[in-house]
């Protein structure tokens, strides 16, 4: 029943974006969601993280996925806990649709920071920074791209080709807006394009 209600709600909300081509998704979301900030940068800062057991997770290895990246530094407490709870709600909306196979949520935390939110591990990765870096340092590297204050935790949305698409600040944003933004990215013009075969001129110039 809950699954059906979420799907119905998303279908009702979707027309708000239906008349907007993919290249306008940032403009539309800026109008609808005060917590949203456009990034539109070709790449993200470096991030070296390990999964439980010591396996290295590379964001580049998820190039075919939309990534929702968040940070839970030590002593972040309530602000981060609230954001994690909202993000699990977004995951729930995503996972009742085919988007589940196209979206990965990544939470970076310090080893002694607790994550109380109930995530679906099917498309959620919990990681810690590599090389003795702190989560706060990694979060600051990402937040440096923002033109807003850094008091609130940020959820970074990374497009399938590694483009740093946008940031959702804090925990007061609409879960449905983030879900619709993810859906828009899945369908928009920023998706990776298949390689094209070289023509004779490209083949000739390639010799030099």
What are these regions (language model features)?
Residues 22-63, 85-86:
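N-terminal "domain-start" segment that seeds a small globular fold
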Residues 2-8:
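Sec-dependent signal peptide recognition
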Residues 122-125, 136, 140-156:
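Structural micro-motif
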Residues 9-18:
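Hydrophobic h-region of N-terminal signal peptides that target proteins for export
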Residues 58-87:
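Short active-site neighborhood of thiol/selenol oxidoreductases, capturing the structured segment around
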Residues 149-208:
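Thiol-/selenol-based redox modules, centered on thioredoxin-like
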Residues 44-45, 67, 152-154:
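Short loop/turn microsegments at loop-to-beta-strand junctions
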Residues 82-138:
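Structural microenvironment flanking redox-active thiols in thiol-disulfide oxidoreductases
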């Amino acid at each position: 029943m809950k699954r059906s209600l979420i799907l119905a709600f998303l279908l009702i909300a979707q027309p708000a974006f239906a008349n907007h081509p993919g290249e306008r998704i940032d403009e539309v979301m800026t109008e609808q969601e005060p917590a949203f900030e456009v990034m539109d940068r070709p790449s993200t800062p470096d991030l070296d993280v390990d999964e439980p057991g010591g396996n290295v997770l590379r964001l580049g290895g998820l190039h075919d996925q939309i990534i929702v990246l968040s940070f839970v530094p030590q002593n972040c407490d309530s602000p981060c806990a609230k954001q994690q709870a909202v993000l699990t709600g977004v995951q729930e909306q995503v996972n009742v649709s085919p988007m589940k196979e196209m979206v990965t949520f990544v939470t970076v935390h310090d080893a002694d920071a607790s994550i109380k939110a109930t995530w679906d591990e099917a498309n959620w990765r919990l990681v810690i920074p590599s090389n003795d870096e702190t989560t706060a340092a990694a979060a600051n590297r990402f937040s440096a791209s923002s033109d807003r204050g850094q008091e609130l935790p940020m959820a970074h949305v990374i497009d399938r080709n590694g483009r740093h698409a946008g940031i959702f600040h804090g925990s007061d944003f609409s879960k449905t807006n983030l879900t619709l933004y993810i859906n828009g990215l899945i369908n928009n013009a920023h998706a990776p394009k298949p390689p094209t075969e070289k023509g004779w001129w490209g083949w000739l110039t390639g010799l030099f």
